[in-house]
Amino acid sequence: MLEAIYDHTVHPRYLSAQSQVLDLGANYGRFAQAITARFGCRCTAVEPSPEPFAAIAESPLISKMQAAAAAKRGTVPFHIALDSVASSLSRSTPNPVVDVIDVQALSLPELFDRVGARPLDLLKIDIEGAEIELLNSCPASILQQIRQITVEFHDHNGMTPASEVQSTLAWLHKLGFFSVRMSRHGHHDTWIINRNLSAISTAELKFLECVAPTWMGIKRVARRNLKRLAAA
């Protein structure tokens, strides 16, 4: 069954202590901490915003890189939001912007080369609206070396048109990927698996597509209710 690691869905079968993870939009490094604690894998945390980046705790399993993931290399304006998780390359972030700074941007092929893993076991993307351009600009030969992707698309809050998300997913499907939308509204939590790099059957994929979103939704509600009871 699929598993949620700090609000991002992954398949645990394809992660181990030998795995390499690339975390784009690492913020304060909580996903990196959670994924390495769960699997003992190595994770490269990529974050452009200075304050969250400085707070990411490096370890033998976690390394960090200060950069924005973008379609191409260069210096780009980055919008610092009041809520740090909403900071973005896009000016259309729904959260109030408190500052705009210039940051280094690297493309996915460049980030992939710096990590050096072939294949990459997991790519996590949470880059506040820049994910469509990032994926669409990446050569198929690079994407096809990624075993699974967990991505937060931003059609749920209006930053990205739903049609663009569907178009990007359709292209990934043509490359041999299969996707499961885990969120009720939009593609806030989407899990994507490379069928060519994973021994996963069509029957299992259909089961996960039909059952996993509901089952994991029930678990999320149960956890929230337990927290409320514990706080009462």
Description of each model-found segment:
Residues M1-A232:
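Phosphate/nucleotide-binding beta-alpha loop and adjacent structural elements of enzyme active sites
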